[in-house]
């Protein structure tokens, strides 16, 4: 399992944002799923992502990720407007598994409200990650 970036924040639903919780509101953040999620899902074969301009709400479903094992809802860890979608994942879904905290990012949001976010240590502890 990949190391959790310490400068990211995490949701209980296994999404990450590339910012700390205290610096989120008013900024644009990238969002993806964690290595814990990709390990549990297995090989990702499809992702339905929100569209640019969509409003997402923290804790609400905004897409889904399909793997060889199951289909899982994608939840937004923040509230705001989608400003970009990583079209590259549609060309190669394996990047979500291979680089979940880098090239496997899913979408970007201009944040108006943060949800309940955890530090890397809190997320690791809650999910039994060393």
UniProtKB/Swiss-Prot annotation:
Transmembrane segments: none
Obligatory cofactor(s): (R)-lipoate
Domain of life of the source: Bacteria
Keyword check for Lipoprotein: no
Keywords: Lipoyl
Entry-linked PROSITE patterns: BIOTINYL_LIPOYL, LIPOYL
Domain Lipoyl-binding: residue ranges: 28-110
Keyword Protein transport found: no
Modified residues (N6-lipoyllysine): 69
SUPFAM superfamilies (UniProt xref): Single hybrid motif
BP-aspect Gene Ontology terms: glycine decarboxylation via glycine cleavage system
Any single Gene Ontology cellular-component annotation: cytosol
A Pfam family this chain is assigned to: GCV_H
InterPro entries found in the cross-reference section: 2-oxoA_DH_lipoyl-BS (IPR003016), Biotin_lipoyl (IPR000089), GCV_H (IPR002930), GCV_H/Fam206 (IPR033753), GCV_H_sub (IPR017453), Single_hybrid_motif (IPR011053)
Cofactor remark from the record: Binds 1 lipoyl cofactor covalently.
Record's function text: The glycine cleavage system catalyzes the degradation of glycine. The H protein shuttles the methylamine group of glycine from the P protein to the T protein.
PANTHER family for the chain: GLYCINE CLEAVAGE SYSTEM H PROTEIN, GLYCINE CLEAVAGE SYSTEM H PROTEIN-RELATED
Assembly: The glycine cleavage system is composed of four proteins: P, T, L and H.
NCBIfam families associated with the record: gcvH (TIGR00527), PRK01202.1 (NF002270)
Family assignment from sequence similarity: Belongs to the GcvH family.
Name of this protein: Glycine cleavage system H protein
Lineage summary: Bacteria, Bacillati, Actinomycetota, Actinomycetes, Mycobacteriales
């Amino acid at each position: 399992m990949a190391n959790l970036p310490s400068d990211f924040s995490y949701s209980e639903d296994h999404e990450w944002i590339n910012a700390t919780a205290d610096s989120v509101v008013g900024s644009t953040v990238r969002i993806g799923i964690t290595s814990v999620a990709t390990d549990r899902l297995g090989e990702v074969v499809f992702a339905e992502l929100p569209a640019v301009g969509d409003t997402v709400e923290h804790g609400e479903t905004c897409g889904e990720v399909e793997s060889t094992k199951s289909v899982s809802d994608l939840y937004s860890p923040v509230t705001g407007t989608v400003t970009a979608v990583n079209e590259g994942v549609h060309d190669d879904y394996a990047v979500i598994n291979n680089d979940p905290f880098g090239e496997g990012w899913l979408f970007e949001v201009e944040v108006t409200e943060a949800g309940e976010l955890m530090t890397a240590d809190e997320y690791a502890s809650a999910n039994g990650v060393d």
